[in-house]
């Protein structure tokens, strides 16, 4: 297949809370799963190192061979080594969600690696989240889908109301394991900080892409990201992506960036090198999962977006959402 080099164009309180808790979301009401506040990484994770951090730039990453059992499950050679062309100049990173303390340490490292480049925090979570007293907390529904069906504007409005009502109140926050509510703690909320404010407090820019956990993003989010990439000089920006765990939604947009910046690298090599630096292997869809259809769509779409970006002229003239609608109609 002929490779098409992507063209970048430089750029230029209580009553409210009570009502929100009763309201929940339409998706939650339908499933019978009552949403709640959850610690993003456990009761004490804010005291531990930030999880799933990787920096893809020269001298900052390591390719870790896949576990042989996982490689067999994915249909891969456990000894395979991907092409690393372009990795040294990707200038991207990824991680799980961060507490205030995590973010301050991360910001220092990003500045060192960015070396004067403009830094963007790319938030790949649609679900509501904020820092309560510096600790990352989110609004959790079944499968982490409390905001299922919402637009980004609707999600952000709910997030602002829900979390904005918390200062001066006591709120119960839970741990979650395997979609089950676990240990809880009461928090007397003194401060609430939203992620955009956190990013800007370090002088960084902020971009939010609506993507539901475990899932392929809304097609409009892919449009949004590709349009964003048209407005920046890829050699003069550093992009830090994150979601909740930092393994899948983060991986999607890190991989799309790689595809756009390195059009001569094969799909298979891009997928493998991201899996070997900390991402989930996106082409694999677990057929035994009870959301196998969600994983199957994600696996299909990541390949299709590669094809879209490599179809001569497509990405410069046709939005991804229109292109994929045409493919689905065939």
Which residues does each PLM region occupy?
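Bacterial N-terminal signal peptides
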Residues: 14-24
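Intrinsically disordered, low-complexity Ser/Thr/Pro-rich tracts
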Residues: 207, 244-245
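Cys-dependent protein tyrosine phosphatase-like superfamily
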Residues: 26-239, 252-330
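Ser/Thr-glycine-rich phosphate-binding loops at phosphate-binding pockets of nucleotides
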Residues: 243, 249-250
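Bacterial N-terminal signal peptides that target proteins for export
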Residues: 3-14
């Amino acid at each position: 297949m002929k490779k098409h080099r992507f063209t970048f164009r430089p750029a230029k309180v209580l009553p409210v809370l009570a009502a929100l808790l009763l309201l929940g979301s339409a998706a939650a009401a339908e499933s019978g799963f009552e949403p709640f506040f959850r610690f993003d990484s456990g009761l004490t994770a804010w005291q531990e190192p930030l999880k799933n951090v990787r920096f893809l730039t020269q001298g900052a990453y390591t390719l870790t061979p896949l576990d042989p059992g996982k490689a067999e499950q994915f249909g891969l050679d456990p000894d395979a080594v991907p092409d690393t062309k372009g990795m040294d100049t990707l200038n991207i990173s990824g991680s799980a969600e961060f507490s205030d303390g995590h973010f301050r340490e991360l910001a220092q490292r990003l500045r060192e690696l960015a070396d004067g480049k403009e830094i963007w925090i790319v938030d790949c979570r649609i679900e509501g989240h904020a820092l309560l007293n510096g600790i990352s907390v989110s609004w959790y529904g079944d499968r982490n889908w409390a905001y299922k069906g919402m637009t980004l504007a609707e999600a952000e409005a709910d997030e602002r109301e829900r979390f904005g009502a918390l200062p001066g109140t006591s709120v119960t926050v839970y741990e979650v394991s395997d979609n089950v509510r676990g240990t809880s703690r009461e928090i007397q909320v003194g401060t609430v900080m939203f992620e955009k404010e956190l990013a800007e407090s370090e002088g960084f820019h902020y971009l939010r892409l609506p993507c539901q956990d475990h899932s392929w993003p809304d097609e409009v989010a892919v449009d949004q990201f590709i349009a964003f990439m048209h407005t920046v000089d890829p050699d003069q920006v550093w992009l830090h992506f994150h979601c909740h765990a930092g393994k899948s939604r983060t991986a999607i947009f890190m991989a799309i960036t790689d595809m756009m910046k390195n059009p001569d690298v094969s799909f298979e090599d891009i997928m493998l090198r991201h899996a070997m630096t900390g991402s989930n292997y996106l082409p694999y869809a677990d057929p035994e999962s009870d959301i196998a259809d969600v994983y199957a769509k994600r696996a299909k779409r990541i390949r299709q977006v590669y094809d879209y970006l490599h179809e001569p002229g497509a990405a410069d003239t046709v939005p991804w959402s229109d292109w994929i609608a045409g493919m689905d109609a065939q």
